[in-house]
Amino acid sequence: MSRIARTFAGLKAQGRKALIPYVTAGFPFPDITPELMHAFVAGGADVIELGVPFSDPSADGPVIQKAGDKALAAGIGMVQVLDMVRTFRTRDASTPVVLMGYANPVERYNQKHDRHDGKSAFVLDAAAAGVDGVLIVDYPPEECEAFAAELKSAGLDLIFLLAPTSTDERMQQVARVASGYVYYVSLKGVTGSGALDTGAVEAMLPRIRAHVQVPVGVGFGIRDAATARTIGQVADAVVIGSKIIQLIDEQPRDQVGPVAQKFLCEIRTALDN
């Protein structure tokens, strides 16, 4: 059983829901990420999604795009992201870490670090660094069977997005290769956009669960404790990204961790009560 699966199983046994914060690696300061990840855990995070900066992030709204641009300008790439996870693991061997990003940085890493043995350098190095799962936004499930098999052999989960527009056929395709959890994108559009229709989310989750056996996390549009509580009543996990990025942007360095931790404590309390 993977670290992600163990985490969800433990939460289910306690009747609790997973809190999954997201941050772009290297934002808002290039060397703050491991420290910020520990602040997330202190605030009640169960899983951490770490965004890999990319120059053309098609699913990301302006808030996360800006964070990615800032991280890229500071020289943050896949090598640095894996180093951050490795550093985090020196003090935390239990909190699952998921890398979220796009195919291009993964493929570039494989090309640059090719071992000429037919195996994915990214998968092997991610596993060695302490990564638990991977969510590649632009990898369609019908083309992912070989990648999923490589990840599984290395002990990593492959996580997919589902959307309000996802058909039953797409859900079945995702179910064949997904592990860990699936991430339901509760809004049409990009991250941080629009108001969340909690009723629509509640109506969609039984459809997803009819096809998908892994836990279902919900993200996009969750900005406060009240919304998180409502979503937590129907989902297995609540994912929050853009709001965290907004809160820590422009904070002085010594306030980044405390501000994020305080916000997550509020969300955690709402989910648990």
From Swiss-Prot:
Gene3D superfamilies: Aldolase class I. Its EC number is 4.2.1.20. This is Tryptophan synthase alpha chain. InterPro entries: Aldolase_TIM (IPR013785), RibuloseP-bd_barrel (IPR011060), Trp_synthase_suA (IPR002028). One of its GO terms (cellular component) is cytosol. CDD domains: Tryptophan_synthase_alpha. It comes from Albidiferax ferrireducens (strain ATCC BAA-621 / DSM 15236 / T118) (Rhodoferax ferrireducens). The keyword Chaperone does not apply. It catalyses: (1S,2R)-1-C-(indol-3-yl)glycerol 3-phosphate + L-serine = D-glyceraldehyde 3-phosphate + L-tryptophan + H2O. Keywords: Amino-acid biosynthesis, Aromatic amino acid biosynthesis, Lyase, Tryptophan biosynthesis. Pfam families: Trp_syntA (PF00290). Pathway: Amino-acid biosynthesis; L-tryptophan biosynthesis; L-tryptophan from chorismate: step 5/5. GO terms for molecular function: tryptophan synthase activity. The alpha subunit is responsible for the aldol cleavage of indoleglycerol phosphate to indole and glyceraldehyde 3-phosphate. Signal peptide: none annotated. The active site is at 49 (proton acceptor), 60 (proton acceptor). Belongs to the TrpA family. HAMAP family: Trp_synth_alpha. The keyword Lipid biosynthesis does not apply. Tetramer of two alpha and two beta chains.
